[in-house]
């Protein structure tokens, strides 16, 4: 059953590039990318932003009444995170949020995607509200608005209160209702200032990596628990959408899904069918119930699990949405594994350069998946809510951070996004991952995704050269 976990990748060749003063990028063995021309392919009202998550940047895990999260507990288990590192102090954004807003302004961002820490609002998951936690997000949202930056919050980005995990976590149906109650509290407080909300970030990772492979918090390896968690995550999403619209009828509600689209390892019928099965357990398992109202029955059959579906659950899960968020980093190379269980697939990587995460690169797969969202699931308007790459960045003697690989990755994927728009996809925005280098979950502080470099001993933020290139493109797109 572990074979269901989200893994794999594909890459395309590229080499180091040289940033030029005339806003082009020259790559050895390839044509020059005209960033100004690329910028003109996006509408002037296109949303340009950056993303983070509360546990990855805030720190202050024991301040002002915040409760323990499953990631706080997970990081104490030997061997679960790099060097036993946790989200304390991360980027210390709880205290340095004004610095983060200044970085956003310098980059030219029009929006900022961040998450709200459930344990900071409800330390026990339910019950009494921690007013200090709520007040912190209120001042932060006000700070963004004063800077002319649209807040784009996520209600849940993997930091379940440990108290709820102790009572069963996402495999328990009670957690879905607890999430809806939490959503009502937050939206009741901030919904007068924030228009666009996402309920969940990447329920696939919460379920498959948290409860199936055990690679992420809470570190459980149980197939039945994982499938129950997947259902209750989506049920919580639907209940939260209903609760939000009850509290604030004019909000725009969405969900954020990650995908690693399956590429067959060969043209053999066996590998092609393995890729189909992999997509069923990845994108279809989470998209189908939200947009089509049902789970892929084939996955239930070959997994041998019992789904805890009750009357009206699928109607709640498929509640109408206003927008859809796509998180894309890499595709997966899939081969048939006749000796495996579950999906009987082998996940791997093709030859070629990889990011510092070991992930392959193919922007065309993102373009094709954007088109699939439109044609197969008929999603509402779409935002690319995460897309980015990690590289082994370092500060040069002149104090700058030269990261041409990240810039090339960005431009290739923005080109793919523009191609999707030209193919008729209603794509409204792009959020680069990430605003800052930060705590990369089980990888600790070993991987850097930021467009701004964080010197962790001093917490100094320095915009990387890729961030400056991105900023030029944003301003060109907006006519600046």
Which residue stretches match the model-derived regions?
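Active-site mouth loops of central-metabolism enzymes
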Residues: 82-95
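Active-site region of glycoside hydrolase catalytic domains
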Residues: 28-81, 124-126, 134-480
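Glycine-rich, proline-tolerant flexible connector loops at the mouths of alpha/beta enzymes
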Residues: 116-129
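Catalytic domains of carbohydrate-active enzymes, especially glycoside hydrolases
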Residues: 96-117, 323
């Amino acid at each position: 059953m572990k074979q269901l976990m989200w893994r794999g990748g594909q890459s395309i060749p590229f080499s180091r590039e040289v940033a030029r003063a005339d806003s082009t990028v020259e790559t050895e063995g390839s044509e020059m990318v005209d960033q100004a021309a690329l910028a003109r392919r996006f509408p002037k009202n296109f949303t340009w932003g950056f993303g983070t998550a509360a546990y990855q940047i805030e720190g202050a895990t024991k301040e002002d009444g915040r409760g323990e999260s499953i990631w706080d507990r997970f990081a104490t288990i030997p061997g679960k995170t790099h060097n036993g590192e946790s989200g304390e102090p991360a980027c210390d954004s709880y205290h340095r949020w004004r610095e983060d807003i200044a970085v956003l302004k310098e980059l030219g961002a029009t929006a900022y995607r961040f998450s709200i820490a459930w344990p900071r609002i409800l330390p026990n998951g339910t019950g009494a509200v921690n007013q200090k936690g709520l007040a912190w997000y209120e001042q932060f949202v006000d700070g963004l608005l004063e800077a002319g930056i649209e807040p784009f919050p996520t209600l849940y980005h993997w930091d379940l209160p440990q108290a709820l995990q102790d009572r069963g976590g996402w495999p328990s149906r009670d957690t879905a209702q607890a999430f809806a109650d939490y959503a009502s509290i937050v939206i009741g407080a901030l919904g007068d200032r924030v228009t666009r909300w996402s309920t969940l970030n990447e329920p696939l990772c919460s379920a498959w990596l948290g409860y199936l492979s055990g690679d992420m918090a809470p570190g459980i390896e149980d197939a039945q628990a994982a499938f129950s968690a997947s259902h209750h995550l989506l049920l919580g999403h639907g209940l939260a959408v209903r609760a939000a619209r009850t509290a604030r009828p004019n909000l725009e509600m969405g969900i954020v899904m990650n995908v690693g689209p399956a590429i067959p390892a060969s043209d053999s019928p066996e590998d092609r069918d393995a890729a189909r099965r992999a997509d069923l357990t990845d994108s279809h398992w989470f998209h189908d119930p939200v947009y089509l109202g049902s789970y892929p029955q084939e996955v239930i059959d070959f997994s041998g699990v019992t789904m805890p579906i009750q009357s009206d659950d699928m109607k709640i899960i498929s509640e109408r949405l206003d927008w859809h968020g796509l998180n894309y980093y890499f595709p997966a190379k899939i081969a048939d594994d006749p000796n495996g269980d579950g999906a009987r697939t082998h996940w791997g990587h093709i030859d070629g350069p990889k990011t510092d995460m070991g992930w392959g690169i193919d922007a065309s797969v993102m373009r094709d998946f954007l088109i699939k969202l439109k044609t197969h699931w008929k999603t509402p308007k779409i935002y690319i809510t995460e897309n980015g790459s990690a590289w082994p960045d370092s500060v040069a003697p002149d104090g700058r951070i030269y990261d041409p690989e990240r810039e090339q990755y960005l431009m290739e994927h923005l080109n793919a996004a523009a191609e999707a728009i030209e193919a008729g996809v209603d794509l409204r925005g792009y959020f680069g991952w990430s605003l800052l280098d930060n705590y990369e979950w089980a990888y600790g502080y070993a991987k850097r995704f930021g467009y701004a470099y964080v010197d962790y001993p001093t917490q100094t933020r320095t915009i990387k050269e890729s961030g400056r290139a991105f900023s030029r493109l944003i301003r060109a797109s907006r006519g600046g």
